[in-house]
Amino acid sequence: MTDILPQEVWLANFPFAEDETQSKNRPVIVLDVDDETCSVFSMKVTSKKPYSEFEIELFDWAEIPLDHISTAVASQVIEISKSKFIKRIGRLSNDDWENVNDLHNRYLKSIGQIF
């Protein structure tokens, strides 16, 4: 498998938050990588605008390339096995990468993970 790197967007088998025995292949943004797992943002491919303070629209979604306006959801950051990654879609623009990291840090502060 190709190396998986932060800032990349991959198609991966992502478990549902409500029932982790169920999953869906969906785009994810890679935040961090270690030997066996990757921390990823869930990315809902939707034409709807973000509705939570912990969601952000990707401005350069077409350059990745994705088919639709896409929203990154900070409350759904999880670690998933590299074996769940299917194929590389592309890479976030530097502006979107900065926005995603800022969103992630704001979310972590809100739940007391960082101060």
Where are these regions (language model features)?
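Compact nucleic-acid interaction/catalytic patches
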Residues: 18-25, 30-63
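C-terminal terminal-subdomain/extension
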Residues: 61-115
